[in-house]
Amino acid sequence: MGRRKGKKSAKETGVLLRRHLRYRLREGCFILALAFSAFLFIALLSYHRSDPGWSHSIVVKHVANLTGEAGAWLSDFTLYMVGYLAYIFPLMVAFAAWVFFRNRHEEQDIPTKWPLLILRAVGFLLILLAGSALAAIHLGTLDANLPYNGGGIIGVVMAKSLFPIFNTAGTSLILIAFLLIGITLFTGLSWFQFLELLGKNAIKFTKFCAIRLGAISWKDLFLSLLPSQDKREAVTVPKIKRVEPDLVPDALDMISTPKIAERPKLEIIDHEFKTPRFKGSAILPELSLLDKPSQDHTLSYSEEELQQKSREVELRLADFGIQAKVVAVHPGPVVTRFELQLAAGTKASRVTNLAKDLARSLSVISVRIVEVIPGKSVIGLELPNKNREVVTIYEVLATKQYQNARSSLTLALGKDIGGHPVIVDLAKMPHLLVAGTTGSGKSVSLNAMLLSLLYKSTPQQLRLILIDPKMLELSVYEGIPHLLTPVVTDMKDAAAALRWCVVEMERRYRLMASLGVRNILGYNAKVKEAIEAGAPLLDPLQAAAEGKPPELQELPQLVVIADEFADMMVVVGKKVETLIVRLAQKARAAGIHLIFATQRPSVDVITGLIKANIPTRVAFQVSSKIDSRTILDQQGAEQLLGHGDLLYLAPGSGVPVRVHGPYVKDEEVHRVAEYLRESSEPNYVEGILDEMGAQDLSGFVEAALGGGSEEGGESDPLYDEAVEAVIRSRRVSVSSIQRRFKIGYNRAARIVEAMEAAGVVSPMENNGAREVLAPSKE
């Protein structure tokens, strides 16, 4: 056994030794082949006809060839035989040596490679024969330094053999075919793979050139490289106006440049409204109380960048299999809208589903897709600007659109994506629902709405009820003359204020019905006309025992603003929802309007009843598509940018408008509020926040309409005590009598009416307050 192991070990040693010698021999041959190739290449480069050579006999003292006389003979021989092909002969020899000796670690012997070597040798000969023949036909004697011909003697013989049969064109075609076959056999190159690789690189190069030169196809790229006069003769570029162009179905094949819409220049009215536009003592705030915007407004994108961005959008959509062309671009203060004309048969929903992928590929925070643009057959793609512009309250309130608005309930929402001011009328909404997450700009937008109301209306035109559970946002307006009651911070007081609004709504409806008018504008016009005619109308709802009833006065608009009504829904419960729905259904004609905001856009806060009766919504940035659908009944708010970026859904419209809300500084709000406090003192209405005990809403409204028990008046056993209490406290209201003596609303109302008839208290004034006329007993 030991002998066997020894024999086996000796045999393995011999195999390893032979393999090692074979490897070294192959490496040595490879080095010799490379050296021969380098020698021949240098000899060919330094060839000169004055040197001695194989094709001629000459005696010289000095050989010009760098490789000496041997190199001169060798170079002369190869050039004489194959002509210009001699210059690639060294490279072919080096390549053949590298192919033959490269796999030095293979276990197979050289004889097993003979079929492959024979094919490579055949390819080598085909390259020399076909290449030299082509050189002999087309190059000939171009270079006088050659010993014979551009194709050598071999090329001349091959050309003379084929030329009489196939002529020049046929001979060249046959030789090119054999040359390509020879390259394939010698190098192993696959022409199909080469063409496929060439096509892929050509597409990549085309995309790169398209982005750089503003083209999207080879046709576009070729035309973009032509002189401008040639381009004008080749194609007429359509001018895309503000109206939608009539695009044919193959519009994607047309050469078109997207229209870059110019930013609008806002018309600023510099003069101040220091005098009221109506009768009264109060004056409107001055615009100088607000901070003017900086004048250095720089565009976020230049026109060239917008053109390049348009092409990039088209290319990114093409990467996802969507063919589209940008036909118009609308740059704005915060976002830029690209209007896309989709190819025929492409659904807009495909683009919508790619919003996140497009945002990633375009390297932006978010992308919003507008599937329907009214009046146009395109879709919108909104991208955030790299430099965001700050929209200030001054530049919106100072615009011609706001200053020329006739309504006293004009709201300034901000600017749209094109930079145009968005001015709306609260009276036409007639109520507004605002929702958005914390930090999205909701409270700042409420301040902007409040300022736009205060800059349009005096206390004679507008009265406010502000509900602020946070005790921070709206408390700065405490003490302004527009308030009906101090800023409400307790949610139970807020419910009482809404109940008072219901009673006031019913009272106004009864007044309008008695005059035969349909809304508060008709009522005020009729009352004003009667006053100017010298025959004022009397209040039909109040009868006086002595003298005549009080005269009717114009009724102000009433706006209830709640910064967070979700707390009301939690604390008070379903009763608040019933009150809100009742006001939303009927209060428009009575001149009572609601603006409710919440940071919890959930179905338990924004209920179906509230949504059905408040069709106008403003959605700021939310965290999910579900929250967006809760507010707008559609997605989109989750793609907003925050900081005042909002979607405004107008009544009767299913397409929200993107608006950038104005930024209002705390200092500006303080200055305006202080100005209003100095101009006039507040005139609060007593009893608005008085609670009504356990009386439910139906009984409350029935009492407000005059129903219930007939007991009351001077015959009431509590009348004397009530008169004494009123004279002592110097305050009177139905709610205070009801709360003090624990009686029903209708009974307390009759006691107050009896006091008015007896001259103890004055008739109800325009703001609902009464004055105690009876002297104090002290």
From Swiss-Prot:
Membrane topology (Cytoplasmic): 193-778
PROSITE patterns: FTSK
Keyword Cell inner membrane: yes
Cited InterPro entries: AAA+_ATPase, FtsK/SpoIIIE/SftA, FtsK_4TM, FtsK_alpha, FtsK_dom, Ftsk_gamma, P-loop_NTPase, WH-like_DNA-bd_sf
One annotated Gene Ontology cellular component of this protein: plasma membrane
GO BP terms: cell division; chromosome segregation
TM spans (from-to): 28-48, 81-101, 122-142, 146-166, 172-192
Subcellular location: Cell inner membrane
Entry keywords, A to Z: ATP-binding, Cell cycle, Cell division, Cell inner membrane, Cell membrane, Chromosome partition, DNA-binding, Membrane, Nucleotide-binding, Transmembrane, Transmembrane helix
Topological type in the membrane: Multi-pass membrane protein
One annotated GO molecular function: ATP binding
UniProt domain comment: Consists of an N-terminal domain, which is sufficient for the localization to the septal ring and is required for cell division, followed by a linker domain, and a C-terminal domain, which forms the translocation motor involved in chromosome segregation. The C-terminal domain can be further subdivided into alpha, beta and gamma subdomains. The alpha and beta subdomains multimerise to produce a hexameric ring, contain the nucleotide binding motif and form the DNA pump.
Assembly mode: Homohexamer. Forms a ring that surrounds DNA.
Function statement: Essential cell division protein that coordinates cell division and chromosome segregation. The N-terminus is involved in assembly of the cell-division machinery. The C-terminus functions as a DNA motor that moves dsDNA in an ATP-dependent manner towards the dif recombination site, which is located within the replication terminus region. Translocation stops specifically at Xer-dif sites, where FtsK interacts with the Xer recombinase, allowing activation of chromosome unlinking by recombination. FtsK orienting polar sequences (KOPS) guide the direction of DNA translocation.
Family statement: Belongs to the FtsK/SpoIIIE/SftA family.
UniProt-recorded name of the protein: DNA translocase FtsK
Source species: Coxiella burnetii (strain RSA 493 / Nine Mile phase I)
Organismal lineage: Bacteria, Pseudomonadati, Pseudomonadota, Gammaproteobacteria, Legionellales
GN (gene name): ftsK
